[in-house]
Amino acid sequence: MPLQIIVTAKQVIDPEIPKSAFTIDAASKRVVVPSSFLPVVNGFDENALEAALRIKDTQSAKVTVLSVGKDLSINIMRKLLAMGADALVLVQDVLFEEGIDSRVTAEVLAAAIKKLGAFDLILCGRQASDWDHAQVPLLLTEALGVPCVTLAKHVEVREGRVSVERVIPEGLEVVEVPLPALVTVSNELGVPRYPTLRATMAANRMRPTIWKASDLGLDASQLQPSLQLLDLFLPTSEHQCEFIEGSGEEEVARKLVLKLREARLI
């Protein structure tokens, strides 16, 4: 029986969009991006998919990508099918319009995974590039009651166990846990494979599975966020430039040293 691998993926604002393109809706406390800028798949989640595909390259495995969100673009998410995933499941609902926090996201993911059935390995990106919270994988592993290993650089499955080479401040360490398990994958894994034209065309013919919250047995009362966002704003910065003048380089240097000492920089 093939190894059942689930990869979680998030659709995010393109991190390459310039700051000047953003605005903030003060009433809803939401980031507003012009429609000309398309969203992308979170880069760390592409690393997670690459880890899954490397396992699939060496043994029989089925890779299912699971995404939760609002206004998910099927065309954007199809890239993951083109990369080599076998199936794509999207969970989106009007109940998500008001925003769901990390806890609710993890609960929705857990419900969707239980609906999918038995699994061997869940791979998640180490964090999302929009908020950088890195909370969902840890909440998800708690909800499912499986062991978790974070910050993977290399993932290998053998004999009912997953061996993970993970990144730590001192270098690398190897951790091994029994399956089923959840592993978060870091960008140190390497560059994800690029979809071929043939794979992209094949992915365009594949239909994702689309579920609503009710399909997972969830209602509005279970989707209320625990986190209250008090304010959201673009940081402001003030730059002051002062030209130091003098009769020569030595005088300018002395004045510069005095200024730096006054500012307690030296």
Residue ranges and their predicted role:
Residues M1-I266:
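N-terminal glycine-rich FAD/FM-binding segment characteristic of electron-transfer flavoproteins
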